[in-house]
Each structure stands twice: as C-alpha cells, then as structure tokens.
C-alpha cells in the first residue's frame, strides 16, 4: 500500500515528518510512504502574534482539507499547535513517545534567566510563556515574535530587534539537532508547558482504520495517557487561543497520573494554577477544569 504524508514545509515540520515516515517504513516494509508539502495560512501570516490571530487552526486548515478530500492519507503536526477539537471526519492516532516537553531560553549574553538585567527584552509569541515569566520577573519586558526556529534565533542575534533572549520549545530544538544553543531549561512545574507540548500529532481520516491501526501499534502508552489528559483540559478551557493555558502531566511510578495546570485571563492579571491526580486520563482533565470552575 502507498501512503501520502502531508506536512508543512518548514525545516522542523519536515524533520518531524521524515521521522514518522522512517518509522513507518521500518515497521511496515511492505508499504511505501511519501511526503506531500502543503503551505498553510500560518506559513503565510508571520507578522502577527498567535493570540492576535485567534485560532490554532491556521497552521493546519489546508492540511486537514487535503485529508478530507483524500489527496493525502495522514498528516504530521506538532500537537501543541493543534485545535482542541479534531475536525469532523478526522482523528488523531495515539501518541508516540513524547519529546522533552519543557520550554527553554536562548539568551544573547546572560548566563541564565535570573541574571538578565532589569528591563531586558524577551521575544515570544506565546501569551502563556510571557505571563508565567512575567510573574517570575516583573521587571522584564516581552515582545511578540513569530517565525520558525531559524528566524527567531536570527532575530535574537540581530541587534536591530533589541532582544536579549527568546523562548522556544525544547522538543523542536532537539529534533533539529540544535539543543547545544539552549541557555536554560525552564522547570515545567514553574513554567507550565503548552498542553501536549513535545507530542507529535499524527492525523488521519476516521474511516481509514487500517492505517490508524498501523500508526497506533507504534504508540507509547504513558505519552498517550498524558497527552489525552492535557488535551482534555485544553478542550474544556475553550482552546487556549485568547488566554494562557498550560498543562503538564506525568505518569507516577505506580501508574497514576499527576497533572499541574494553568489558566488565566487575556491580560495575565489573573492566573490560576492547580494540581490533580487520578488514574483515568479524561477524568484527570475534567477534574482540573472542574476545580478551576470551567465546567
């Protein structure tokens, strides 16, 4: 059987899709796989912060349309960029082994976040990241920055942008082989990551059960349970487009789930954080939302 894998054309998207292609080829040598590059609205609109655009779907709309039309068979995304609800007729496969979920800092000269001088400027397009870092250092300024990893690092090094540092996801830098450029890893209990950060989203049509079964056979149980808990919470918050939403779930030694979550308003004047534990992924997500008064 021949399968077409849809992907964005950025360097990171291609690295992730090549990884999925390689694993599928190794597991199913009787099948063939090819990458199909699709340009999305998010690739074209690069001058606005994510919160101002108002939807995560702008990274995936054209790819999901290709899935629904049958011009591709599966698609690979970063799960943290996906809308809280899957498009009608589509579904996500179970999560494969998760990459590092942490946020990281790349600083121009300072050796750590605590060493940044008062008034330093940090670039991030994420309200979640800016809100949490501002709570730790209210004397630091934040400015919106968009673009792929190369673009953001180039802006940091270009003095005309006036940046002292940028915030990125460890997973992307690791996948690109650029982890040596990280200045500091941020504790996920302090700066809570985006829901399902570090997880690859592999999406198919619901009716394509044979392909879905093949993808699911390569899944990682702990990563999948954690991702389901985090994304259940994300869905119950309304999707995380206009408000800071974070979730970090880990599997304890006894198999129970422990999740810390964050939810705030759009100006970061009210930030709530709570911790929940449980055994069922969806129930943990629902309990977190209930404790915050979201359901």
Swiss-Prot record:
Protein name listed in UniProt: Porphobilinogen deaminase
Further facts: The porphobilinogen subunits are added to the dipyrromethane group.
UniProt modified residues of type S-(dipyrrolylmethanemethyl)cysteine: 241
One Pfam short name: Porphobil_deam
The protein's role, per its UniProt record: Tetrapolymerization of the monopyrrole PBG into the hydroxymethylbilane pre-uroporphyrinogen in several discrete steps.
InterPro entries: HemC, Porphobilin_deaminase_N, Porphobilinogen_deaminase_C, Porphobilinogen_deaminase_C_sf
Cofactor note: Binds 1 dipyrromethane group covalently.
SUPFAM superfamilies listed in its UniProt record: Periplasmic binding protein-like II (SSF53850), Porphobilinogen deaminase (hydroxymethylbilane synthase), C-terminal domain (SSF54782)
Disulfide bonds listed in the record: none
GO cellular component terms listed in the entry, alphabetical order: cytoplasm
Family membership noted in the UniProt record: Belongs to the HMBS family.
Enzyme's top EC category: transferase
Gene name as annotated: hemC
HAMAP family membership: Porphobil_deam
Record-listed E.C. numbers: 2.5.1.61
Pathway note: Porphyrin-containing compound metabolism; protoporphyrin-IX biosynthesis; coproporphyrinogen-III from 5-aminolevulinate: step 2/4
Organism listed in the record: Lachnospira eligens (strain ATCC 27750 / DSM 3376 / VPI C15-48 / C15-B4)
Cofactor names: dipyrromethane
Key words, A-Z: Porphyrin biosynthesis, Transferase
Species lineage: Bacteria, Bacillati, Bacillota, Clostridia, Lachnospirales
Subunit structure: Monomer.
GO BP: any one term: protoporphyrinogen IX biosynthetic process
Domain of life: Bacteria
MF (Gene Ontology): hydroxymethylbilane synthase activity
Catalytic activity: 4 porphobilinogen + H2O = hydroxymethylbilane + 4 NH4(+)
